[in-house]
From Swiss-Prot:
Pfam families: Proton_antipo_C, Proton_antipo_M, Proton_antipo_N. It comes from Poa pratensis. This is NAD(P)H-quinone oxidoreductase subunit 5, chloroplastic. Belongs to the complex I subunit 5 family. NDH is composed of at least 16 different subunits, 5 of which are encoded in the nucleus. The chain crosses the membrane at residues 1-21, 31-51, 81-101, 117-137, 139-159, 177-197, 211-231, 250-270, 272-292, 319-339, 346-366, 388-408, 417-437, 534-554, 602-622. GO terms for cellular component: chloroplast thylakoid membrane. It comes from the Eukaryota. It is an enzyme of class 7 (translocase). It catalyses: a plastoquinone + NADH + (n+1) H(+)(in) = a plastoquinol + NAD(+) + n H(+)(out); a plastoquinone + NADPH + (n+1) H(+)(in) = a plastoquinol + NADP(+) + n H(+)(out). GO terms for biological process: ATP synthesis coupled electron transport; electron transport coupled proton transport. Its EC number is 7.1.1.-.
Length: 702
């Protein structure tokens, strides 16, 4: 119970300082980063200690004390430590401390520095409390705290209307899921009379043999619990808040997508897995929602230009893989992918923050420009360390061995094919799409040449770079490919002449270039970030390279007794399950693994190759092949293919028209209903009342 409380002293101290000695606290604001990192480091030590206990003893520790007691009702508060909790504790604390270190450099010039550290520390505390909860009502309490912190951080730059709108959108969308979760909790309490996990699981085991509980009611309550996870983990159809959540600072985007907000939904399903697995209809629904989400997220990421939104849709798709794995009963594969994806995605988001940081001297603090991949390109020459780490993170998410995500995604794909060819086909095809859009992000950001000199760029179809979209870099004729630095007479970028000034949130970094003659001229150019931002990238790169090996089979030393190979993760997660197989099947399993791996890697390589053809250096080569171009132009199918490309691009760039549908049907529909209600209330109800009074008055006067 100590682990969730460790960050609280720092939060309280910062709040006390801001309230009583605000000037001194703000002047010494960067000092507060040290105790935040220190206390979270202590939490890591405790988490690792508990994990070692779980590996060696494989026992569950539970301590409860009474929270509210009367004659009929007792509400208890405690903690539950098991392998699932141990995994989440290590994941949250390691990613959390790296994000804190990164934030010290990223937010150093922001006036909301202290407020950001208060929010992010409380965010970590809430998530730690959630994963150590021992009952449903305790989970719901921390569930709401996690949501509150995420809303505060999404709308951190609240002076920007778009950030405030994104905060509101996340709040409203998650209200749907949270309300369903609350109803599900109350429903299961009414059915079972308990909120403790151990009691729920015991009763769930007796549902099938006894048939003493209404199956329709239990299915409905389980669906309501699942609805909470759908909203939190941005699953279809409650996924619309996640891309807009990128309006918050980049470090919190990394934390939300790796170890906190969206991971909470997956954790809830994993925690209640013994309950859901006893209801086959809900398991089918979980796998179906996961399949739809993983494919939808991949298609929506194909044509995005904002680097963070592209990664957000990638997260949505990967969470769909986890949902699919849980729905088909592949508990270990889902948690394995949760671990590997968390470190790879944290690396990618923090890397994107480094890219944005390097673009700001050129374009000013304007997310529409600093996060726009259309204006990037050629950054590998200016930020080589960021480029290297981002490339490894990209290849990991694409499923290239031996990187982390390869092992977990390959396991999910294999289990999907075994469960249903329908799920296997969609999951495998989406794996190819994942490789395509992830390598597209890398190529648009780091390959080629710097495109920031497009002074007349706009996001409309008439814009000069509108054609840099889904289908490759069709370069305008007026492009200077030898352009390196953008310079004006004042020594700053042309974009900086019209920088949107945001109160309290601006960061002005102008690079300085000294000539050999001693004269100092100011240029705007991309530059590598500081050590406090590079250090977390290198640590996350280490995890991305090696964390996948916990899922690789190893010899447990008992092959002579007919015991097959195990994995460290399976030994940790399911210590009580007999995982032994005949040694004669070991070769078959190895053969199947190699076959499945070749298939998944081939799909990833195809996706990488297509992305390189359309966005890489090879694009210009293929454009210059006159024979192929003339053949294509004369082909009667050209018009058909162009129309198909436009349809796919419009679908992807416009987010599948889902946001438009929600706006027109729900937002405008509810507003129309409220206006109708207002008219009925004031015009009819009040009119009748006032009319009766007026008639009575006239009669009385007469």
């Amino acid at each position: 119970w100590v682990i969730p409380l460790l960050p609280l002293p720092v939060i309280m101290s910062m709040g006390f300082g801001l309230f009583f000695i605000p000037t001194a606290t703000k002047n010494l604001r960067r000092i507060w980063a040290f105790p935040s990192v220190l206390f979270l480091s202590i939490a890591i030590v405790y988490s690792v200690h508990l994990s070692i206990q779980q590996i060696n003893g494989s026992s569950i520790y539970q301590y409860l004390w009474s929270w509210t007691v009367n004659n009929d009702f007792s509400l208890e508060f405690g903690y539950l430590i098991d392998p699932l909790t141990s995994i989440m504790l290590i994941l949250i604390t390691t990613v959390g401390i790296l994000v804190l270190i990164y934030s010290d450099g990223y937010m150093s010039h922001d006036e909301g520095y202290l407020r950001f550290f208060v929010y992010i520390s409380f965010f970590t505390t809430s998530m730690l409390g959630l994963v150590t909860s021992s009952n449903l009502i305790q989970i719901y309490f921390f569930w709401e705290l996690v949501g509150m912190c995420s809303y505060l951080l999404i709308g951190f730059w609240f002076t920007r209307p778009i950030a405030a709108s994104a905060c509101q959108k996340a709040f409203v969308t998650n209200r749907v899921g949270d309300f369903g979760l609350l109803l599900g909790i109350l429903g299961f309490f009414w059915i079972t009379g308990s909120l403790e996990f151990r009691d729920l699981f015991k009763i769930a085991n007796n549902w099938i043999p006894n048939n003493g509980i209404n199956s329709l009611l239990t299915t409905l309550c389980a669906f309501l619990l699942f609805l909470g996870a759908v909203a939190k983990s941005a699953q279809f159809p409650l996924h619309v808040w996640l891309p807009d959540a990128m309006e918050g600072p980049t470090p919190i985007s990394a934390l939300i997508h790796a170890a906190t907000m969206v991971a909470a939904g997956i954790f809830l399903l994993a925690r209640l897995f013994p309950l859901f697995i006893s209801i086959p209809l809900i398991m089918t629904l979980i796998s179906l929602v996961g399949t739809i989400t993983l494919f939808l997220g991949a298609t929506l990421a194909l044509a995005q230009r904002d680097i963070k939104r592209s990664l957000a849709y990638s997260t949505m798709s990967q969470l769909g893989y986890m949902m699919l794995a849980l729905g088909i009963g592949s508990y270990q594969a889902a948690l394995f992918h949760l671990i590997t994806h968390a470190y790879s995605k944290a690396l990618l988001f923090l890397g994107s923050g480094s890219v944005i940081h390097s673009m700001e001297p050129l374009v000013g603090y304007s997310p529409d420009k600093s996060q726009n991949m259309v204006l990037m390109g050629g950054l590998r020459k200016y930020i080589p360390i960021t480029r290297t780490t981002f490339l490894w993170g990209t290849l990991s998410l694409c499923g290239i061995p031996p990187l982390a995500c390869f092992w977990s995604k390959d396991e999910i794909l294999s289990n999907s094919w075994l469960y249903s060819p329908f799920f296997g086909i969609i999951a495998s095809f989406t794996a190819g799409l994942t490789a395509f859009y992830m390598f597209r992000i890398y190529l648009l950001s780091f390959d080629g040449y710097l495109r920031v000199h497009f002074q007349n760029y706009s996001t409309t179809k008439e814009g000069s770079l509108y054609s840099i979209s889904l289908w490759g870099k069709k370069i305008s004729k007026g492009v200077n490919r030898d352009f390196v630095l953008s310079r004006t007479k004042n020594g700053v970028s042309f974009f900086s002449q019209n920088r949107p000034q945001i109160q309290g949130n601006t960061r002005n970094r102008i690079g300085c270039f000294s000539t050999s003659f001693g004269a100092k001229n100011n240029f705007s150019y991309p530059h590598e970030t500081g050590n406090t931002m590079l250090f977390p990238l290198l640590i996350l790169l280490f995890f991305t390279l090696f964390i996948g090996f916990i899922g690789i089979s190893f010899d447990n030393g008992a092959m002579d007794n007919g015991i097959a190979e195990l994995t460290l993760l399976s030994k940790w997660l399911t210590p009580s399950i007999n995982l032994t197989q005949e040694s004669s099947n070991s070769f078959i399993n190895s053969y199947e693994f190699i076959t499945n791996a070749i298939s998944s890697v081939s799909l990833a390589i195809i996706g990488l190759f297509i992305a390189y053809i359309l966005y890489g250096s090879a694009y210009s080569f293929f454009q210059n092949l006159n024979f192929i171009n003339s053949f294509y132009k004369e082909s009667p199918k050209k018009y058909f293919f162009d129309q198909v490309k436009k349809k796919i691009y419009s679908w992807s760039y416009n987010r599948g028209y889902i946001d438009i549908f929600y706006t027109r049907v729900f937002t405008l529909g509810i507003r129309g209903l409220t206006e109708l209600t207002e008219f009925f209330d004031k015009g009819i109800i009040d009119g009748i009342t006032n009319g009766v009074g007026l008639v009575s008055f006239c009669i009385g006067e007469g």
